């Protein structure tokens, strides 16, 4: 039997095809100059669940199912009376994905989740931060196959931030296009 370790599909594609395409397109002289994915951060704001801790727990459970690892609950830093918010209350959840889990999530996002979004026309190609990172938002988390539609109590939105080692937005956009991100502009 072969003792071959599992490697995510997109990681193999990056190693075998994308690196060469990026090197050719931008004329890098050193292999270490070629941009790569650094991490993907998933953030879910659950402000409506402040009063109900059960809703917060279901949101954390859903994010764990989507990401494949346990999320960190983000807490309020200070009290705001107008929002009935006290310091230390859970107001969101976040997960940072790296290495193989990052590539697996990206594969599910591009091939399964984005095509399932209602009225999806493509991603905004101008949502880069100037340092090679891309941020996008989803209005509902139901587009992921890990979520059972029948057992959902509430629909949550989420932010997805893709961090790369690219030095410019142009390099980062070229990298994400190679990963089949459906940019409109």
From Swiss-Prot:
UniProt record, GO biological process: translation
GO molecular function: rRNA binding; structural constituent of ribosome; tRNA binding
Any single GO CC term annotated in Swiss-Prot or TrEMBL for this entry: ribonucleoprotein complex
Record keywords: Ribonucleoprotein, Ribosomal protein, RNA-binding, rRNA-binding, tRNA-binding
InterPro entries: Ribosomal_uL5, Ribosomal_uL5_bac-type, Ribosomal_uL5_C, Ribosomal_uL5_CS, Ribosomal_uL5_dom_sf, Ribosomal_uL5_N
Task performed by this protein: This is one of the proteins that bind and probably mediate the attachment of the 5S RNA into the large ribosomal subunit, where it forms part of the central protuberance. In the 70S ribosome it contacts protein S13 of the 30S subunit (bridge B1b), connecting the 2 subunits; this bridge is implicated in subunit movement. Contacts the P site tRNA; the 5S rRNA and some of its associated proteins might help stabilize positioning of ribosome-bound tRNAs.
The protein's assembly and partners: Part of the 50S ribosomal subunit; part of the 5S rRNA/L5/L18/L25 subcomplex. Contacts the 5S rRNA and the P site tRNA. Forms a bridge to the 30S subunit in the 70S ribosome.
Family recorded in the similarity comment: Belongs to the universal ribosomal protein uL5 family.
NCBIfam families noted in UniProt: PRK00010.1
Protein name, entry field: Large ribosomal subunit protein uL5
Organism: Caulobacter vibrioides (strain NA1000 / CB15N)
Gene: rplE
